[in-house]
Regions:
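Active-site helix of classical SDR
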Residues: 116, 152
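Conserved glycine-rich Rossmann-like NAD(P)H-binding loop of the short-chain dehydrogenase/reductase
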Residues: 26-42
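Substrate-binding pocket helix/loop in short-chain dehydrogenase/reductase
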Residues: 92-93, 97-105
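Residue(s) in the substrate-gating loop at a strand-loop-helix junction
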Residues: 136
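SDR active-site lid
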Residues: 165-229, 240, 244-247
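Conserved glycine-rich cofactor-binding loop
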Residues: 12-13
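Conserved NAD(P)H cofactor-binding loop of Rossmann-fold oxidoreductase domains
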Residues: 84-89
């Protein structure tokens, strides 16, 4: 058993898989979770680094799912949390089923907030711990045809900044917001966005590079990091661009049928 223990959510593929790989390489015992059986295959990959790996299949859109994840830690001190689990959804809001957009809200907002509250309390009590939350540059942009998803990431970006202020006197506890742009993961397929300009773009960011940027910022105790120079530029411009313009720009890349041949 290693001295260090980390939890990584959404770890079956993509950015979460890469974050779990980095944690295992750095000598952490890890508890990994995803809402699919693939998490067990991912755990086999992480075991090659010689540390203890525990995999949990749980739905983090529910309080019960988060509780099941934390119960799997068996009371062990959590030194590091990568709150990466998220859910995306494309198409026009009025065409979406309530159960589908509720899954976005419950996973990205409710489940994340509850998990952070449960993990941060003991971290603050002992003045030690690191938390990485996967936000998004989408939080800066009114997301036409991804309205609920972008709204959920706007919550995360604001929520993390507020927590950082509330906990500024908690020496030894840091919270870092990782804000990627479009990344080459299963996100767009799962969100039914492969027929969109952004979903079909072959030049998405490498999840391993995004994870490394987040990990480096986490270890350095930084408040936030935008991964990739194009995303840094886009997030900067979003602060000075009217919302109506941003929404139209987002429509052009996220509306169904905009995929380029």
């Amino acid at each position: 058993m290693a001295d260090k223990f980390a939890i990584i959510t959404g770890a079956s593929t993509g950015i979460g898989f890469e974050l779990a790989t980095l944690a295992a390489k750095q000598g952490y015992d890890i508890l990994v979770v995803a809402n699919e059986p693939l998490i067990n295959a991912a755990a086999n990959d992480f075991e090659q680094f010689g540390n203890t790996v525990t995999a949990v299949e749980a739905d983090l859109s529910t309080i019960e799912g988060v509780d099941a994840l934390l119960a799997a830690a068996n009371g062990r001190q959590i030194d590091l949390l990568c709150a990466n689990a998220g859910h995306g959804l494309g198409h026009a809001f009025l065409d979406q089923e309530v159960r589908d957009w509720r899954m976005v809200v419950d996973t990205n907002i409710t489940g994340t907030a509850y998990l952070l509250q449960k993990v941060l309390k003991p971290m603050v009590a002992r003045n030690a711990g690191k938390v990485l939350v996967t936000g998004s540059i989408a939080g800066y942009i009114p997301g036409s045809f991804q309205a609920v998803y972008n709204g959920s990431k706007a919550f995360i970006d604001s929520f993390v900044a507020a927590l950082q202020n509330e906990l500024k006197d908690a020496d030894g506890v840091t919270i870092t917001n990782l804000m990627p742009g479009p990344t080459d993961t299963e996100f767009f397929a799962r969100g039914d966005m492969l027929d969109t300009d952004v979903g079909s773009d072959p030049k998405k960011d490498d999840p391993a590079k995004v994870a490394q940027d987040g990990w480096d910022a986490l270890m350095a105790g930084k408040a936030s990091v935008v991964s990739g120079w194009k995303n840094k530029l886009q997030s900067t411009l979003a602060n000075v661009t009217p919302n109506a313009v941003l929404a139209e720009q987002h429509r052009n890349m996220a509306e169904p049928g905009t995929a380029k041949d």
